[in-house]
């Protein structure tokens, strides 16, 4: 089992990038939820409210995914910091195993989120 390795610094940069992106999605969910409330105020139709509930649930799920990702990334960051704390020159030359799982979860999350956003925008077009 050949595991890919990368420099500690590169992994750290990747983590920062993920956290920035997750921050962006967190803000975006807040905005989408506001739009959803507007729809609820304008429409009392049962069909619409069923869809509203669907999106509410989706936003909760995606928020949980974000929290889970952030948590995982922070654990990895702590592990990196421990390696560096033990040996401060490790940053320059030490390689660590590439964190494929987080990378995969991240792209899976982003794909899902973009699909959801598309679906939601179509819904808004119909009901706003």
Task: Show where each model-derived region lies.
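Charge-rich amphipathic alpha-helical interaction elements
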Residues: 2-128
């Amino acid at each position: 089992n050949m595991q890919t390795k990368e420099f500690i610094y590169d992994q750290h940069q990747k983590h920062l990038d993920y956290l920035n992106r997750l921050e962006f999605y967190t803000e975006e969910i807040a905005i989408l939820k506001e739009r959803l409330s507007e729809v609820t105020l304008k429409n009392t139709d049962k069909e619409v409210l069923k869809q509203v509930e669907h999106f509410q649930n989706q936003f909760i799920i995606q928020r949980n995914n974000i929290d889970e990702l952030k948590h995982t990334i922070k654990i990895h960051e702590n592990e990196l910091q421990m390696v560096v704390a033990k040996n401060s020159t490790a940053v320059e030359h030490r390689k660590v195993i590439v964190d494929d799982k987080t990378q995969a979860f991240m792209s899976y999350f982003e794909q899902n989120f973009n699909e959801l956003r598309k679906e939601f925008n179509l819904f808004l077009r119909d009901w706003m």
